[in-house]
Amino acid sequence: MRMRHKPWANDFLAENADIAISDPAQYKGRWNTVFGNDNPIHIEVGTGKGQFISGMAKQNPDINYIGIELFKSVIVTAVQKVKDSGAHNVRLLNIDAETLNDVFERGEIKRVYLNFSDPWPKNRHEKRRLTFKTFLKKYEEVMGETGEIHFKTDNRGLFEYSLKSFSEYGLLLTEVSLDLHNSDPKGNIMTEYEEKFSALGQPIYRAEVEWRTKDRL
């Protein structure tokens, strides 16, 4: 999908530097100082327009959230949503997920959210999928010995691929739903895509896996 250029985006992000962190690598290993507390940190890779992360932050004030979004034209919308929500436990980073271990120390992150990631359906693009083994390794590098991935998608092919990828990587599947909205999901915060697909009657697939790297070190 082609993103519309927003020439004002740089100025907007600079004006909201308390939310959109411009040089996140400087905080590697000390994100607690950014939030002013030692609460656990959860990240969302591919934060999009920010509905999920701002909702989660409001629902869980004792957890710190960091959203990762590659596209500047999208993250500006997320910044505005965080501002409108009034949540103070959210920061947003305009970076590539490939650079996670440049930004976070091992063990600094407790949970990774992957919501409606691009399925990259062509085989030649497999390495771009956020549940491909090289990305799982990056999540491992920032979570350390324990951690979790919470994964949602409307794409059955990506879901099946991801379950296989998780299993081959040695992760433990703790929850799985083939139709999330018909299984009474407690505390579920919907993304913009989730609202759209759910309204069309499409099932939403969800999985939780535990990161038990100590079993493989």
UniProtKB/Swiss-Prot annotation:
Its EC number is 2.1.1.33. Residues 124-129 are annotated as: Interaction with RNA. One of its GO terms (molecular function) is tRNA (guanine(46)-N7)-methyltransferase activity. Pfam families: Methyltransf_4. Pathway: tRNA modification; N(7)-methylguanine-tRNA biosynthesis. InterPro entries: SAM-dependent_MTases_sf, tRNA_(Gua-N-7)_MeTrfase_Trmb, tRNA_methyltr_TrmB_bact. The keyword S-adenosyl-L-methionine applies. Belongs to the class I-like SAM-binding methyltransferase superfamily. TrmB family. This is tRNA (guanine-N(7)-)-methyltransferase. The lineage of its organism: Bacteria, Bacillati, Bacillota, Bacilli, Bacillales.
